[in-house]
Amino acid sequence: MDERRTPSPCSSRPSSPRTPPCEMFGPVGIEAVLDQLRIKAMKTGFEFNIMVVGQSGLGKSTMVNTLFKSKVWQSPAPNLDVPMPQTLELHSVTHVIEEKGLKLKLTVTDTPGFGDQINNDKCWDPILSYINQQYEQYLQEELLITRQRHIPDTRVHCCVYFVPPTGHCLRPLDIEFLRRLCRTVNVVPVIARADSLTIEERDAFRSRIQQNLKNHCIDVYPQQCFDEDINDRLLNSKIREQIPFAVVGADREHIVNGRCVLGRKTKWGIIEVENMAHCEFLLLRDLLIRSHLQDLKDITHNVHYENYRVLRLNESHVLPRGPGWVNLAPASPGQLMAPGPEKVRKRSKDPRDDEC
């Protein structure tokens, strides 16, 4: 029986060939390319699309505002007269953030209603459908014969999953969600409201979560198979040891010892968001913005979107020609909610992979 093969995410990112260096007689100005890239980046800016998933009351909106130090997302005031939504609803908001002349077009997608129902069966389907709809929209734009010079990128580059601070282990809902979504999008789990746990409880909770992820073969970002060199391996190994980050969100400033800090004021003191002794928010911000933002976008395009594109092209046997463009057969709801490949092949065989 013929078995349909899914593309390998790792094989979608070809490694650079080992070409011997050429001896040069003098400088030719190659370093000026960096200036060209910088000037172009200053003109066009960047796009980054992030999704936050978690139950109500875990501080998702506050965390997004804290990450970008802007009022990106306004939390609606609690209203007891408004009934809880019976279905998961996705809401997106887009802002342009500018820092030192560089513009970032940020789109944040919230998922109110996730995990809030008595029966949460298949509550991940709307999220999975939304992610694949963005892939489908980008694919349809790519297939146009006369297409835009710059295709608008609405694909989700990162999904931050907020784990409730129960102090025990991952719930079945958490495991099922992570297992399905990790095949389709970059997922970064965090321990929400970590100030409700002691340092000992937090470390023990993290260890149990890491063991849960290993037992269920859930490969969250950054995946080991994407480490391209020794520097990536060293940096990402430290990150993998600390995931999920224990975070606290706050968008208000307080005066502590004569300095202004972001934090939450409590009866026993102020929890400083940017103090590693209080929480690991800095690690999350460094991962999402300062060190891995472009890598998140590259993996989205070269791995997750490429998997979706190849599967859609394989499933569409006929490509009917329209007036000036080529259109795939419409994606069915089942295709939009289908998870990605079960398992990815590694560049080099790792004996630890056999455990999964």
From Swiss-Prot:
Residues 44-317 are annotated as: Interaction with SEPTIN7. One of its GO terms (molecular function) is GTP binding. Residues 256-356 are annotated as: Self-association (via N-terminus) to polymerize octameric septin 12-7-6-2/4-2/4-6-7-12 filaments. Predominantly expressed in testis and epididymis. Component of the sperm tail annulus (at protein level). It is found in: Cytoplasm; Cytoplasm, Cytoskeleton; Cytoplasm, Cytoskeleton, Spindle; Cell projection, Cilium, Flagellum. Keywords: Cell cycle, Cell division, Cell projection, Cilium, Cytoplasm, Cytoskeleton, Differentiation, Flagellum, GTP-binding, Nucleotide-binding, Spermatogenesis. Residues 7-16 have a biased composition (Low complexity). Residues 54-61 are annotated as: G1 motif. Residues 1-23, 330-356 are annotated as: Disordered. GO terms for biological process: cell differentiation; cytoskeleton-dependent cytokinesis; protein localization; spermatogenesis. Belongs to the TRAFAC class TrmE-Era-EngA-EngB-Septin-like GTPase superfamily. Septin GTPase family. Septins polymerize into heterooligomeric protein complexes that form filaments, and can associate with cellular membranes, actin filaments and microtubules. GTPase activity is required for filament formation. Interacts with SEPTIN6 and SEPTIN11. Self-associates. Component of a octameric complex consisting of SEPTIN12, SEPTIN7, SEPTIN6 and SEPTIN2 or SEPTIN4 in the order 12-7-6-2-2-6-7-12 or 12-7-6-4-4-6-7-12 and located in the sperm annulus; the octamer polymerizes into filaments via the SEPTIN12 N- and C-termini; the SEPTIN12:SEPTIN7 association is mediated by the GTP-binding domains. Filament-forming cytoskeletal GTPase. May play a role in cytokinesis (Potential). Involved in spermatogenesis. Involved in the morphogenesis of sperm heads and the elongation of sperm tails probably implicating the association with alpha- and beta-tubulins. Forms a filamentous structure with SEPTIN7, SEPTIN6, SEPTIN2 and probably SEPTIN4 at the sperm annulus which is required for the structural integrity and motility of the sperm tail during postmeiotic differentiation. This is Septin-12.
